[in-house]
Amino acid sequence: MPGALEEHAEVVAAAEQWLTKAAGGVTPDYLAPAIIARYGKDRTFSVPILTHCALAGKGRWKDVIQLPFELAALPRNWFAALRLPVVSYALPALIAIGQCRHQHRPSWNPFTRVLRNAAREKTLQVLEQIQPSNGGFLEATPLTSFVTMSLAGCGLPDHPVARKGIEFLHASVRDDGSWPIDTHLATWVTTLSVNALGEDLPDDARAPIREWLLKQQYRE
């Protein structure tokens, strides 16, 4: 934002100081390895964060791991075998972020490059099909934002998925200008509690919880 650095110079300086202490510096040479190391093999957040940095001009596309979005063009009954569950963080981010990275730094392999170019339209159709009617993927602001910014970043700001994502973000912003991580955490908190209790969960409580969880499932 124009003037933001000057207006919030103290906050920016404090953030840079913290990052320098945690990662060793604030250049891509320091931040990219630190982000990847922080999340390990889980690319759910490291790849979107690095994509955001690259789109903002604070990172390098070579540091963004290419997600194989072309896999989303395969038949849906293959998704489980490929560990691509439809209702998860995996698929929307795979498609949008994968396409964005491919747009800015395509593979050196001509076969892979042609394959991904051919899969772009099909996988965008899949992304449109799995987007809920309110535009929010899993009712989650981070995921919806990652998808929306990636589509805009690869030249598709007016794509229906991007437009619905923006509508969701506008509709879910709080009065103070912030967003909740998710608009409804009850399902997540309930499943975490059930997993924590394990065999100690009373038998008479299991059926009501199971029925409630089933009612939360999207059926679009």
Regions flagged by a language model, labelled:
Residues 1-220:
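Preference for long, amphipathic alpha-helical scaffolds in soluble/luminal domains
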